[in-house]
């Protein structure tokens, strides 16, 4: 079944999705147990470079847009360029989420794990809203799709390789700068599994949201 709803509703839902996802990144980062795989490299750089997590995310994801341009060349179009404002907005909402959550830092390990899980849930819900809106992709997902389509590799396979490469890059950066592993911990592994799991759980909810948008 195809769904057709106004661009205004889609845009509003998309912004809500970016906001919720940004807060999810902040919630999964604040406990200090690591963060989601795609955010692990930007997060580790913040321990070395005096910039915010949002800015680090923007800078590093710009390379994924550049990589798409290199692969596609003349076929690089507006739908790929649209990833730039999406990235800028997401970076802003990550920093907004970090500001919003700075007032509460969990003390016990149980509370830190709990906040990590809640952050994964927020991130999954935010991604779900973005999928419903279907306006633009984040540069990382855009890069994965381009590689999948151009080289005829299943999207899921490319996603696993991409996330693994980001985490490995974060570990290498950490070892080179700090001579130990910083910023990549059990929370990174938890996020790698839980975000995808929560997205699968909310498939029925996503369909209901689509139906509501038709009203």
Where are these regions (language model features)?
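Core subunits and conserved enzymes of cellular information-processing
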Residues: 1-215
């Amino acid at each position: 079944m195809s769904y057709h709803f106004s661009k205004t509703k889609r845009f509003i839902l998309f912004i809500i999705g970016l906001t919720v996802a940004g807060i999810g990144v902040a919630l999964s980062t604040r406990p200090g147990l690591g963060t989601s795989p795609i955010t692990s490299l930007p997060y580790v750089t913040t321990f070395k470079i005096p910039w915010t997590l949002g800015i680090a995310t923007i800078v590093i994801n710009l390379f994924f847009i550049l990589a798409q341009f290199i692969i596609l060349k003349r076929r690089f179009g507006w739908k790929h360029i649209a990833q730039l404002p999406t990235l800028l907005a997401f970076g802003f909402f990550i920093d907004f989420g970090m500001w919003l959550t700075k007032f509460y830092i969990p003390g016990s390990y149980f509370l830190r794990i709990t906040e990590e899980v809640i952050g994964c849930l927020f991130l999954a819900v935010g991604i779900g809203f973005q999928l419903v809106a279907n306006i633009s992709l984040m540069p990382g997902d855009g890069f994965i799709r381009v590689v999948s389509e151009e080289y005829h590799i299943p999207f899921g396979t490319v996603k696993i390789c991409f996330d693994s490469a980001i985490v490995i890059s974060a570990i290498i950066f950490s070892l080179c700068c700090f001579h130990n592993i910083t910023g990549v911990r059990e929370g990174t592994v938890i996020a790698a599994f839980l975000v995808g799991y929560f997205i699968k759980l909310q498939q029925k909810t996503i369909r209901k949201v689509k139906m509501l948008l038709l009203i």
